[in-house]
Amino acid sequence: MSTDVAAADIPVPQVEVAADAAVDTPAAKPAKAPKAAKAKKSTPGPKKPRVTPAHPSYAEMVSEAIAALKERSGSSTIAIGKFIEDKHKAHLPANFRKILLTQIKKLVAAGKLTKVKGSYKLAKAPAAVKPKTATKKKPAAKPKAKAPAKKTAAKSPAKKAAAKPKAKAPAKAKAVAKPKAAAKPKAAAKPKAKAAAKKAPAAATPKKPAARKPPTKRATPVKKAAPAKKPAAKKAKK
């Protein structure tokens, strides 16, 4: 009887293990579910084909309307809208007016239209592009003018190099002039000549008063000579 009881107790843990295995298997299934969700997200959906409008672009329609209206002060948005509706009524969308306003603003920002007091004109053709190309050609001529300047700059150092020997020649002349400075006794001889020159005018000055005195002396001897002759005549009479 003890052996039968032991045999009856053995299958009990096997049932528990089976129950644990049954519990573990459903827990693994939710882990696979997110992978399937990722696979669904990665698959791209079919793209909707773009509907090509039957009417021309808004830039073409607006420019055509302004050119056809030919208004001096420009065409208003209402006049432009009426012209486009009359020509392309069957192909325009229901929100045509709103799209037209936004497209006109974009054309003004791009410089294709000019706004004048609530009306719009076609922008003038860029005629200023040609003068810009002419100005670009002028700077190309400047490097040519710089090339001769470099030649002259190269020649000027050669001239300076040639001028340096000339500067040395005056230095030699100064070296020759130094012996003249040594001959200072000649400079001492000059004062003697000056002293002699001073003596000459000093001697000339006494001659002037001597020249004045002789006339007075001459006048006196003439008077004395006359009475001397008279006694001589008396002797002749005797």
From Swiss-Prot:
This is Histone H1. SMART domains: H15 (SM00526). PROSITE patterns: H15. PANTHER family: SINGLE MYB HISTONE 4, WINGED HELIX-TURN-HELIX TRANSCRIPTION REPRESSOR DNA-BINDING PROTEIN-RELATED. Histones H1 are necessary for the condensation of nucleosome chains into higher-order structures. Residues 133-197 have a biased composition (Basic residues). Residues 21-57, 123-238 are annotated as: Disordered. One of its GO terms (molecular function) is structural constituent of chromatin. It comes from Triticum aestivum. It holds the Pfam family Linker_histone. Residues 21-34, 123-132, 198-208, 217-230 have a biased composition (Low complexity). Residues 54-124 form the H15 domain. Transmembrane segments: none annotated. Belongs to the histone H1/H5 family. The keyword Transmembrane helix does not apply.
